[in-house]
């Protein structure tokens, strides 16, 4: 069962869907687009996203890290990621936290990316 929807961010990228998807599938590119991530360790030894691929993100400031794991990939449509472990306590408080990133071609030169957050709370 999926936890409740909590928030969503979206961005329009002036690039074709295939280019945006290809860039997003490369785990080594995360620091290039995520403002809080400065480095990624490939825990699964995989440079590309796939179900089961785990990676550790080092956050800006150097104090915190989080381990993320991709659990579902629908090519050119969706990436589902969970947060099994982190050093700032989110995974303990929100044990079912998951992120669904969806990709939608708007035209041949632009793509909408939506990042939706789901998690349960105790209250």
PLM regions and their residue ranges:
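Hydrophobic pocket/interface hotspot
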Residues: 19-24, 30, 55, 70, ...
């Amino acid at each position: 069962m999926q936890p409740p929807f909590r928030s969503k961010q979206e961005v329009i990228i002036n690039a074709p869907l295939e280019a945006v998807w290809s860039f997003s599938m490369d785990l080594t590119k995360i620091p290039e687009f995520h403002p809080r991530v400065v480095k990624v360790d490939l825990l699964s030894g995989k440079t590309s996203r796939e179900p089961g691929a785990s990676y550790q993100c080092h956050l800006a400031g150097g104090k915190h890290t989080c381990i993320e794991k991709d659990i579902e990939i629908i090519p050119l449509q969706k990436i589902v990621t969970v947060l099994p472990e982190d050093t700032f306590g989110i995974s303990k408080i929100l044990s079912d936290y998951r992120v669904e990133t969806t990709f939608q071609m708007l035209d041949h030169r632009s793509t909408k990316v939506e990042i939706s957050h789901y998690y349960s709370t105790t209250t």
